[in-house]
């Protein structure tokens, strides 16, 4: 499978969120994936960046309104990943979204950071929209790593992704999340991401994260898309 590319347009997303808040039923479906031939059982070795986003929910109960919120979150998060043409797949398990990015060149790593900025802002926008209509608050933490990764199709029709970058990104997200709300909205990148970023982006990550769970060097900052951040500042109560 490969993500069907779609440009992330803020005004379109805002309109879609508003429409789904009014009209979306709990069983509304969408399909962001299209069949794609990955050619063989091993792919993207040493050529993949991985982004893990862990959503943080606060809602009183699992009502029909909560289910509606989940559907809207799914739509917007997938749209943010789809904005990057290098995004090969997204794994959604529980509160985790894990994006796999084909990134053989430095400029592709830069685009992964752009996607993280969109994702972070998208979650804040959803939080604002939900607070106006339902008792749900939303935040996230994110982490990214780069390195050897393997896509396995040997057990077709079952597929899977394996590799240290996936484990590292998830572990870093969990560690930051365990610090309660001190770091909500934080973006972590590993050393292997930082050294492949252009200087303008790399210099932004100067605060090193002291990890106790993940034995790799990483850095923490708060990354957000500028246009979307301006909307958030204007609309946040």
Regions found by a protein language model. Name each.
Residues 14-24, 65-70, 109-115, 155-159:
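A generic short-segment signal for beta-strand/edge and adjacent turn/coil regions
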Residues 28-32, 68-71, 76-79, 119-124, ...:
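A short linear-motif detector with a strong N-terminal bias
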Residues 32-114:
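Catalytic NTP-binding/metal-coordinating core of nucleotidyl cyclase/transferase enzymes
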Residues 105-225:
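Catalytic beta-strand-to-alpha-helix segment of the class III nucleotidyl cyclase homology domain
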Residues 2-13, 55-58, 99-104, 140-146, ...:
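Short low-complexity stretches enriched in small and charged residues
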Residues 1-40, 181-237:
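Intrinsically disordered, glycine/charged-rich C-terminal tails and inter-domain linkers
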Residues 19-20, 26-27, 82-87, 141:
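Short secondary-structure boundary segments
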């Amino acid at each position: 499978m490969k993500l069907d590319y779609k440009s992330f347009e803020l005004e379109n997303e805002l309109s879609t969120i508003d429409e789904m808040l009014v009209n979306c039923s709990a069983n509304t479906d969408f399909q962001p994936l299209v069949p794609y031939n990955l050619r063989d059982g091993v792919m993207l070795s040493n050529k993949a960046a991985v982004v893990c986003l862990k959503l943080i929910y606060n809602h009183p109960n699992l009502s029909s309104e909560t289910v509606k919120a989940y559907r809207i979150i799914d739509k917007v998060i997938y749209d943010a990943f789809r904005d990057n043409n290098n995004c090969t797949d997204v794994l959604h398990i529980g509160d985790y979204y894990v994006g796999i990015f084909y990134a053989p060149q430095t400029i592709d790593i830069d685009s992964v950071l752009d996607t993280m900025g969109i994702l972070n802002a998208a979650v804040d926008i959803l939080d604002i929209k939900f607070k106006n209509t339902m008792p749900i608050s939303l935040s996230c933490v994110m982490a990214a790593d780069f390195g050897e990764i393997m896509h396995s199709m040997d057990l077709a029709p079952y597929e899977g992704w394996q590799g240290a970058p996936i484990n590292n990104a998830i572990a870093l997200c969990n560690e930051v999340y365990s610090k309660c709300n001190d770091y909500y909205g934080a973006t972590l990148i590993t050393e292997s991401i930082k050294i492949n970023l252009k200087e303008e982006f790399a210099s932004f990550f100067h605060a090193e994260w002291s990890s106790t769970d993940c034995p790799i060097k990483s850095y923490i900052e708060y990354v957000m898309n500028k246009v979307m951040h301006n909307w958030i500042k204007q609309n946040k109560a």
